[in-house]
């Protein structure tokens, strides 16, 4: 298996999806497609938008490429936390491989996208168009029944950089970007192959791909800096915000006892990460202030409390000094 991800042009992806469906009734190998309303999953609101199901993939390699997002959608996912981007990207960001271990509990030693930020942006736009197509053409659900939630890191300087700012603004309004125009044109050209998708459906696809953002900060990031970045994303960018918090908030003693009681005595970690990470006593009032700020701005704010938990690599499980339980 290659350790590099290769982006496929939108027209190729479009032909692949339509051709595979025509020939075998599957999408990227998925034959049992989920239709909204099937089963026990119920719709849910999310930060001003509508979710046909309250499930979907968290930011990871599974939300880096357009085809992975499509596969998640046809299997029932409707909430997509897009792979995190940061100022260091592409060839400048080395990720040791393999970077994921899931024999029992899941671990990883990777972080932000392995693509360039521009490539990541283009993958998300490709996926956005393909999901709108599949929703209508295969009658899988509403064209506004899924949500893309962008994810950025890891410090204020990087997030304010021209590269990341362009990414954020592009997902807020992609209408003037080259990839948007390319996808729109290709989809219009493919309409003769479609039974249900119309020109009006294509033109109705919203260029406001993301109205929400997830903030990921490094382990050890001070509370004041976290609050400053969160405030910037709400005040300056006008985005609904999710803040990632780490399980180290629980404290060393609680985490050690909980894992031991559950039989995970082989998981090894030290106290130092608990001491340098955001502390519970600082997190609670900070979250309260951010909730108040969001309300004053007419925005939504939430926290993700199960981000990454650093543990020691003792048996060569992954090619790094530490790995993160996810």
Model-derived regions, located:
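Active-site entrance/lid segments in N-terminal catalytic domains of soluble metabolic enzymes
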Residues: 2-9, 16-34, 38-39, 59-61, ...
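A membrane-topology feature that recognizes alpha-helical transmembrane segments
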Residues: 321-325
């Amino acid at each position: 298996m290659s350790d590099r991800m290769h982006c496929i042009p939108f027209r190729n992806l479009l032909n692949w999806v339509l051709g595979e469906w025509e020939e075998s009734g599957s999408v990227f190998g998925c034959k049992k497609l989920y239709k909204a309303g099937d089963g026990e999953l119920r719709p849910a609101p999310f930060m001003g938008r509508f979710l046909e199901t309250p499930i979907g993939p968290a930011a990871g390699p599974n939300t880096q490429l357009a085809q992975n997002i499509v596969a998640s959608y046809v299997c029932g996912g409707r909430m997509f936390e897009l792979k995190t981007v940061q100022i260091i990207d592409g060839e400048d960001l080395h990720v040791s491989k393999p970077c994921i271990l899931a024999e029992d509990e899941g671990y990883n030693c990777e972080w932000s996208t392995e693509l360039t930020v521009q490539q990541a942006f283009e993958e998300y736009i490709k996926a956005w168009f393909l999901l709108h197509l599949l929703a209508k053409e295969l009658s899988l659900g509403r064209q506004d029944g899924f949500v893309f939630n962008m994810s950025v890191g890891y410090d204020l300087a990087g997030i304010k950089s021209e590269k990341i700012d362009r990414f954020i603004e592009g997902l807020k309004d992609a209408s003037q970007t080259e990839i948007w125009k390319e996808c729109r044109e290709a989809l219009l050209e493919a309409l003769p192959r479609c039974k249900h998708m119309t020109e009006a459906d294509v033109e109705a696809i919203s260029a406001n791909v993301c109205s929400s953002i997830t903030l990921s900060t490094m382990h050890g990031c001070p509370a004041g800096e976290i609050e400053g970045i969160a405030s910037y994303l709400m005040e300056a960018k006008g985005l609904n915000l999710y803040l990632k918090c780490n399980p180290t908030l629980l404290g060393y003693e609680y985490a050690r006892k909980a894992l031991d009681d559950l039989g995970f005595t082989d998981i090894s970690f030290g106290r130092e990460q608990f001491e340098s990470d955001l502390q519970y006593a600082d997190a609670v009032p900070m979250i309260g202030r951010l909730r108040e700020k969001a309300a004053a701005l007419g925005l939504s704010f939430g926290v993700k409390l199960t981000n990454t938990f650093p543990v020691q690599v003792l048996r060569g499980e992954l090619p790094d000094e530490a790995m993160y339980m996810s």
